[in-house]
UniProtKB/Swiss-Prot annotation:
Source organism (scientific name): Bigelowiella natans
Protein family membership: Belongs to the universal ribosomal protein uS12 family.
Gene name tied to this protein: rps12
Keyword Cell membrane: no
Locations listed in the record: Plastid, Chloroplast
Name of the protein described by the UniProt record: Small ribosomal subunit protein uS12c
Listed GO MF terms: rRNA binding; structural constituent of ribosome
Quaternary assembly: Part of the 30S ribosomal subunit.
Alphabetical list of PROSITE patterns matching this protein: RIBOSOMAL_S12
Keywords: Chloroplast, Plastid, Ribonucleoprotein, Ribosomal protein, RNA-binding, rRNA-binding
HAMAP family (UniProt xref): Ribosomal_uS12_B
Length: 121
């Protein structure tokens, strides 16, 4: 317990919450342009070829974002919308691309969880 004199000398510090998606700059989504679309492998014990894209955002950041769903139409210079949300088995991937917006197509033949993949009825 600090004394009153110690509290007068220096007040209590507020605990600042560190954001998990700094490139969004406190916005729900951000627009960006794909600079590279490629596949990468997850860390152990998983095995796959995960589709990811390197994106230059309007906020000035360059980030790696995951492309969800089966099949995509993204290529270099595609304009995409990203949201926060990491991929647990891909280190450094802290953002998701939103399907069905801007240049990103919706997932073809999707029946369940359609809203997450930009599919209309």
């Amino acid at each position: 317990m600090p004394t009153i004199q110690q509290l007068i000398r220096s007040s209590r510090k507020k605990i600042t919450k560190k954001t998990k998606s700094p490139a969004l700059k406190m916005c729900p989504q951000r627009r960006g342009v794909c600079s590279r679309v490629y596949t990468t492998t997850p860390k152990k014990p998983n095995s796959a070829l995960r589709k990811v894209a390197r994106i230059k955002l309007t906020s000035g950041f360059e980030v790696t974002a995951y492309i969800p769903g089966i099949g995509h139409n993204l290529q270099e210079h595609s304009v995409v919308l990203i949201r926060g949300g990491r991929v647990k088995d891909l280190p450094g991937v802290r953002y998701h691309i939103i399907r069905g917006t801007l240049d990103t197509s919706a997932v073809k033949d999707r029946i369940r969880s359609r809203s997450k993949y930009g599919v209309s009825k």
